[in-house]
Design a protein with these regions (language model features):
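Ligand-binding pockets and gating/stacking loops
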Residues: 1-345
């Protein structure tokens, strides 16, 4: 299984995992490196919980050849938008896994997206591409969650409704050459599994966790985005991802906060977007949430079978700008990995 955490907008890796303390101040940034529990490895002093668990993480500092403009397609497909694309577009990796391996548990979708919609289109997931809608990620966020249980309808009545729907579909089957009805069939099967078993709904109900566990991850308001065109800062999405993996999902995607810190005022003109301000706000919350996820995976014996990948679409400029921010830098970036039975540290 894989949990992919997309840091919307591209995080400043040289202020997190690849500090340059001996460089001039306009390059070195606001932080000092701190030692970790891995000999010779240092990370940002604002990430103390990760530093204590660095033997459970791997930092890749050599990612390159990204496109310079924002586009989540890079993180979800491993491809840029340059060059010729197939009809329908490239599928994101969750859709590919869903196509090849299918569901691990009949009542839990194989690919689940916990990504919040972003008003800036390129920040959103690219979708199933040429694989078609049958391999889209299941999206349980929002008001539809209350519809994932049967309200006064027996399973017999539900089965009768499914049979009636199938008979109507058959009238159109021969005339359909687009593959759309194949997607409808997949959605119907998925919906039946969700409605006739409580496993998915229970996994999404975080009140089933103890208050102490929820506190370990930290809290956030999904209705409040730091920048309206990014994702909200909700570390409990990491907790939901872990619960969904336990419920049988193969792939869970999460988008987290907004990391496009060019300096000056943010997109709404209501907050200071300098790295000196935003990093002090974001780093501690991220540090707490991601380490809680990794601790949970190890404590529950999921670390061998569940890989966690954390990254953004590119790196940030080595030199701090006149606005006290870092701009886009596609030449090099980093990724953070954990679990998956990999050798870490």
């Amino acid at each position: 299984s894989v949990i992919l955490v997309y840091l919307v907008g591209g995080p400043p890796h040289q202020d997190m995992f690849d500090l340059k303390p001996d460089a001039p101040r306009e390059i070195a940034g606001p932080w000092k490196p701190t030692a970790t529990n891995v000999n010779g490895v240092e990370i940002c002093e604002a990430l103390p919980m990760m530093a204590q668990r660095m033997d459970k993480f791997t930092v890749i500092r050599s990612l390159n050849d990204a496109q310079a403009g924002h586009d989540a397609v890079q993180c979800y497909t491993g491809r840029t938008n340059a060059g010729q694309k197939p009809a329908g577009g490239w599928p994101q990796f969750g859709s590919l896994v869903n196509k090849i391996q299918g569901q691990h548990v009949p009542t839990t979708p194989g690919f689940i997206s916990l990504c919040y919609p972003c008003t800036h289109g390129p920040y959103n997931e690219p979708g199933p591409g040429y694989l078609g809608p049958a391999h889209s990620g299941f999206r349980p966020l929002g008001p539809t969650r209350k519809d994932m249980i049967l309200n006064g309808i027996t399973t017999d009545r539900l089965s009768n409704r499914k049979a009636l729907l199938a008979s109507f579909d058959q009238f159109r089957r021969d005339a359909d050459a687009s593959g759309t009805l194949d997607g409808v069939d997949a959605f119907t099967k998925q919906a039946m599994g969700i409605l006739t078993a409580s496993r998915l709904a229970e996994a999404l109900d975080l009140s089933n966790e103890s208050e102490a566990t929820r506190e370990r991850y930290g809290t956030g308001d999904p209705k409040k985005s730091i920048d309206a065109n990014g994702a909200p800062r909700v570390p409990q999405s990491f907790l939901a991802a872990r619960r969904l993996i336990e419920a049988g999902a193969r792939i869970v995607t999460v988008n987290y906060s907004k990391w496009d810190w060019h300096g000056g005022l943010n997109a709404e003109g209501r907050a200071n977007n300098s790295i000196f301000v935003r990093e002090k706000e974001d780093f501690p919350v991220f540090d707490k949430g991601i380490t809680a996820l990794i601790d949970d995976l190890y404590e529950r014996g999921l670390d061998k079978d569940t890989a966690v990948l954390v990254w953004g679409e590119f790196g940030r400029t080595p030199k701090i700008s006149a606005k006290v921010g870092r701009d886009h830098w596609p030449r090099v970036a980093c990724a953070l990995m954990a679990g998956g039975g990999m050798r870490h540290g």
